[in-house]
A protein has these predicted regions:
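Non-catalytic structural scaffold of enzyme domains
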Residues: 1-127
């Protein structure tokens, strides 16, 4: 293809390495995204799911929000330099900025990372 192909997983993993070599994934699936594993390798130290959260709908209530905050703090306490959100649905809720304020470590929004990498690719191709 002549157009750049950019995905949220690879973009977020690449950005995470800018902030440290101990990356934790926070999402709603048992496994970290394949591109997180591929790019981060041994730098991916843990993948976590907030208790009681099975979809982004569960995040909209107080119980889901509290669970996400608790899991983010757990990851920080496990030694994370950075938390990479592994769910684009979390991104649409603006969770990254809020979790970053709570944990005081970088929390990466996969949609923002994807957009940033795409922007760079478009600039590079049009220069």
């Amino acid at each position: 293809l002549t157009i750049p192909i950019v995905g949220a997983g690879e973009s977020t993993a690449l950005m995470a390495l800018r902030y440290g070599n101990k990356v934790c994934s926070l999402g709603i699936t048992k496994e970290a995204p394949e591109n997180y594993k591929k790019v981060l390798k041994e730098c991916l130290i843990e993948n976590a799911i907030p208790d009681g959260v099975h979809s982004t709908v569960d995040l909209q209530g107080e119980k889901g929000w509290n669970s996400v905050c608790e899991k983010a703090m757990y990851l920080k306490n496990r030694g994370a330099d950075v938390i990479a959100l592994a769910c684009t649905g979390m991104a649409t809720m603006g969770i990254a900025t809020k979790l970053e304020a709570i944990t005081e470590i970088p929390v990466l929004d996969p949609v923002m990372c994807e957009g940033l990498v795409m922007y760079m690719e478009l600039l590079r191709r049009n220069c």
